[in-house]
């Protein structure tokens, strides 16, 4: 089943229990969540090989992790009709979050290798999409900051209007 909306991914940073976290999520899913046909949340996680001291991604490892993400998302979407809603990076781990129709005993069976990383997974019922709404989605202040950053990016790409310096 194709997603009923055009994805709109963006990121923001937060702190949880004095730990730095980066969150990347599909902002557009908010207007459609929960999706009744996808009541199960599935997390796929990898331990980073070279995290920074603050637990976030090391620039040298980022390309490998982005490639792993592309592989995992494609597998989950094509094999399990999963809806990819976001990624959390913290404490030396990258965790991808999906919503699926039902829990399966081995959701990563047949997934392409993403060596040198080993995949871990968990799933649980989340019919109201509470994880997406209450954890992934930014609070009002972080959401306003994210939207402000987008506005500045648009203005920067468009160039400075005449008379404004």
Model-derived regions, located:
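Charge-rich, low-complexity segments
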Residues: 1-93, 99-107, 116-164
